[in-house]
């Protein structure tokens, strides 16, 4: 598999790559201090180092922050790395997080204005319910 245009534009620092690899290998969203615990043996000792890397990885679309869980997941949807609209379904029982990829939802959200005319620059929506396994 080749390197995407986004990957060429945003080469990751050593710390960013280490942190991304840990998040990418995880099967569930990870909190910052869980990430810190996992990267300490790789030379990243300070919480600030983790937070800086997380901020950059979110900014370039390599990971997403699940606001309600204050946790991070890797993005496996290359179109997210250029979009400002993200949406997730979160199971209320098992807490499985699934990224919702919908061109029509993204198009609607980027054109949405509220009744006061506020034009939003980015969205992070979270929908809660029961996954197929937990119903």
In which residue ranges do the predicted regions lie?
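Short, hydrophobic-biased segments on the C-terminal half of alpha helices
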Residues: 51-55
């Amino acid at each position: 598999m080749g390197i995407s245009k986004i990957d060429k534009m945003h080469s990751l620092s050593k710390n960013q790559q280490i942190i991304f690899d840990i998040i990418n290998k995880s099967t569930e969203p990870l909190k910052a201090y869980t990430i810190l615990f996992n990267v300490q043996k790789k030379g990243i000792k300070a919480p600030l180092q983790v937070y800086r890397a997380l901020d950059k990885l979110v900014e370039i679309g390599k990971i997403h922050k699940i606001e309600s869980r204050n946790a991070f997941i890797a993005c496996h949807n290359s179109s997210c790395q250029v979009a400002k609209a993200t949406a997730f379904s979160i199971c209320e029982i098992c807490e499985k997080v699934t990224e919702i990829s919908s061109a029509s939802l993204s198009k609607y959200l980027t054109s949405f204005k509220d009744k006061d005319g506020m034009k939003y620059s980015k969205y992070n929506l979270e929908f809660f319910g029961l996954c197929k396994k937990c119903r």
